[in-house]
C-alpha cells in the first residue's frame, strides 16, 4: 500500500505542475500581445521576460541595464480577469524615470528614454485582484 501511494504522489504532482506553469505562460502571452503594436512601431522586443505571482499590493522589482540614447518600452500583463496591475520605471537613485505610463485592466506599460546608461528598476504591482495571488509577466523592448 505504501509503495502504491508513493507511486501516486509523483503522478498527482505531475498533473498539477503543468497547470500551475500554464498560467504564467498565459500571462507571458498577454504581455507579448501588449507589446505587439509597439513592434510595428519599430521596437525590437527582447526575448528576456520576467514573471511570477504576487498578492494584492505586493511588489516585485525587476532590474534591467538600459543605455542612453535608446527608447525602451516595458509591457506587463496578468492572466487574472478583473486584476489591475501597474509597472513603473525607476533609476538607480530611486527616482521615477519613465516618460510615459499606461494601465488598462490586466495590461500596463511604461516607456523610458534614459538620460544615462545604467541599472533601472521596473516595479511591478498588483493593485487589485479578485484572487489572493495573481500571475504576471513582463517583457521589454527598445528602439
Describe the function of each predicted region.
Residues 8-18:
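Bacterial N-terminal signal peptides
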Residues 81-96:
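Short, surface-exposed beta-strand/strand-loop-strand elements in extracellular ectodomains
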Residues 48-58, 103:
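Extracellular beta-rich ligand/substrate-recognition surface
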Residues 61-79, 121-124:
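Hydrophobic beta-strand segments within beta-rich accessory/binding domains
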Residues 62-63, 107-113:
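Exposed aromatic-hydrophobic patches
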Residues 78-85, 129-131:
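Extended, low-complexity, turn-rich repeat/linker tracts enriched in Gly/Pro/Ser/Thr and Asp/Glu
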Residues 23-43, 120-143:
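C-terminal edge strands of extracellular/lumenal beta-sandwich accessory domains
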Residues 1-5:
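Positively charged n-region of N-terminal signal peptides that target proteins for export
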Amino acid at each position: 500500500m505504501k509503495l502504491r501511494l508513493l507511486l501516486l504522489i509523483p503522478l498527482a504532482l505531475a498533473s498539477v505542475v503543468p497547470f500551475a506553469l500554464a498560467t504564467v505562460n498565459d500571462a507571458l502571452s498577454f504581455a507579448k500581445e501588449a507589446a505587439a503594436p509597439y513592434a510595428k512601431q519599430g521596437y525590437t522586443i527582447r526575448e528576456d521576460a520576467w514573471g511570477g505571482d504576487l498578492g494584492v499590493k505586493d511588489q516585485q522589482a525587476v532590474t534591467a541595464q538600459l543605455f542612453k540614447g535608446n527608447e525602451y518600452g516595458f509591457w506587463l500583463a496578468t492572466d487574472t480577469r478583473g486584476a489591475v496591475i501597474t509597472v513603473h520605471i525607476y533609476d538607480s537613485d530611486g527616482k521615477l524615470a519613465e516618460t510615459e505610463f499606461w494601465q488598462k485592466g490586466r495590461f500596463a506599460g511604461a516607456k523610458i528614454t534614459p538620460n544615462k546608461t545604467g541599472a533601472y528598476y521596473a516595479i511591478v504591482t498588483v493593485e487589485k485582484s479578485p484572487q489572493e495571488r495573481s500571475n504576471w509577466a513582463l517583457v521589454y523592448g527598445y528602439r
